């Protein structure tokens, strides 16, 4: 073999090895199931000829010839799904041949498209500065992501108040807890848990708005009869230098009344899963939502179960201060500067939102009644203790019976919230399950 032929052969082998070493491309696939978009992840190498990969966690095999891609996915139940697409740069478009949902012997064709997801930039976790230009009034999987981030990345951004007003007093969005986002978190898939670390919350204006109200759930008939003149707006002055707030036009008994601020996020959510309609930013669920839990503040880590590729994280409805339950219907509603980072916990079951501070584990139960919310909080805490500490139900009952505290987190929404709290210092006496995730310390 001549030296020229040898050099060419080595060059080809080197190029082939380099392609083999490249990570497979990731695509976000949108399949139109009779007008209902389903979002799934496709992992596939860029090579020509035979290809293998995964679609929504299931294995696939196929071929790529030029810009034409054919592959078959085999589901865990043995069902097959056949895809054919044409690639144009970072986009795929084609048809998916699925089993008919009502008759397994029949097939149904569905159009689909896909966009190629970006590769992680070199250099490790990054700091992103994001200035929002539009806001969401639904927790929806259909809204285009405003930013793509990776586990370990941090984001600095801002939120509006619940009325859609920004730091300069300008109305920027429709009232009703407009949210910043969604943020697409790479590596987050359905069945995972998204950990959101609240690194910084800062007031960015000198006032907040509230009401002189008491929510109906907190009123006796006698008190309700006296409260007919309430529900009037109350503006609060925020002294950012001293970290305190007072009713702006207070007279009489409250003319010298000041309270220390304790900034928090009322809204924090990921997108609901397939089959669920987009959810109002005033509502809550296991995905988070308008939780109005005053422990979601600087230094806390919030854990939310992921139901869509990329999680699709929303945040907003910041409060300068809120008492337990948000009994005035509106807390001290204001805009906020926010910094957060994200991590992904793979393949972890979680029934309800969790919050971890430096000193406590907290589970937020939500339901149509306080009884239902209490049950959800108790079940969620029992699940956490079993997962992270390996406790049996008997052992969990002993820990809860001796040490748990319950607080009413929210009374102002369509559903109510009850939080179960445990001091982490007590649990230092119990050995953790090796490898379980840790949040705030």
Where are the model-predicted features located?
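Short, structured beta-strand/loop micro-motifs enriched in basic residues and often containing a Trp
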Residues: 131-140, 172-179, 279-287
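N-terminal, Lys/Arg-enriched amphipathic/low-complexity engagement segments
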Residues: 121-171
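Bacterial N-terminal signal peptides
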Residues: 7-15
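Conserved mixed alpha/beta catalytic, RNA-binding, or beta-rich assembly cores of soluble enzyme
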Residues: 261-290, 294-371
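Short, Lys/Arg- and Gly-enriched loop/turn segments at beta-strand edges
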Residues: 162-173, 201-211, 310-320, 409-412
């Amino acid at each position: 073999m001549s030296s020229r032929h040898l050099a060419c052969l080595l060059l080809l082998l080197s190029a082939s090895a380099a392609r083999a070493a490249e990570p497979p491309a990731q695509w976000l696939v949108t399949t139109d199931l009779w007008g209902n978009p389903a979002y799934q992840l496709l992992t596939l190498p860029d090579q020509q000829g035979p290809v293998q990969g995964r679609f929504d966690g299931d294995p696939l095999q196929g071929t790529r010839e030029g810009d034409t891609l054919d592959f078959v996915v085999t589901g865990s139940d043995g069902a097959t799904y056949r895809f054919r697409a044409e690639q144009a740069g970072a986009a795929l478009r084609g048809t998916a041949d699925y089993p008919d949902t009502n008759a397994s012997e029949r097939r149904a064709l569905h159009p689909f498209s896909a966009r190629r997801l970006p590769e992680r930039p070199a250099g490790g976790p990054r700091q992103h500065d994001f200035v929002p230009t539009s806001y969401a009034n639904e927790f929806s999987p259909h809204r285009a992501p405003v930013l793509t981030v990776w586990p370990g990345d941090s984001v600095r951004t801002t939120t509006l108040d619940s009325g859609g007003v920004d730091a300069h007093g300008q109305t920027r969005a429709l009232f009703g807890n407009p949210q910043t986002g969604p943020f697409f978190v790479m590596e987050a898939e359905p069945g995972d848990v998204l950990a959101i670390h609240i690194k910084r919350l800062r007031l960015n204006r000198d006032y907040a708005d509230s009401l002189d109200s008491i929510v109906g759930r907190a009123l006796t008939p006698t008190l309700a009869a006296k409260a007919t003149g309430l529900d009037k707006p109350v503006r609060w002055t925020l002294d950012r230098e001293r970290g305190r707030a007072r009713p702006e036009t207070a007279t009489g008994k409250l003319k010298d009344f000041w309270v220390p601020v304790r900034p928090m996020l009322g809204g924090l959510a990921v997108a609901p899963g397939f089959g669920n309609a987009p959810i109002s930013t005033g509502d809550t669920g296991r995905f988070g939502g308008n939780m109005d839990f005053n422990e979601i503040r600087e230094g806390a880590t919030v854990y939310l179960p992921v139901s869509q590729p990329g999680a699709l994280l929303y945040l907003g409805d910041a409060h300068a201060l809120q008492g337990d339950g948000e009994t005035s219907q509106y807390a001290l509603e204001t805009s906020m500067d926010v910094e957060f980072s994200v991590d992904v916990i793979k393949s972890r079951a979680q029934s309800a939102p969790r919050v971890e501070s430096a000193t406590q584990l907290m589970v937020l139960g939500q339901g149509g009644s306080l009884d239902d919310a209490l049950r959800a909080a108790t079940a969620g805490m029992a699940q956490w203790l079993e997962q992270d500490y390996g406790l049996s139900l008997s052992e969990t009952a002993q820990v809860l019976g001796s040490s748990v505290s319950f607080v009413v987190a929210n009374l102002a929404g369509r559903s109510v919230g009850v939080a179960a709290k445990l001091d982490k210092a007590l649990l230092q006496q119990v050995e953790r399950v090796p490898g379980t995730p840790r949040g705030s310390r």
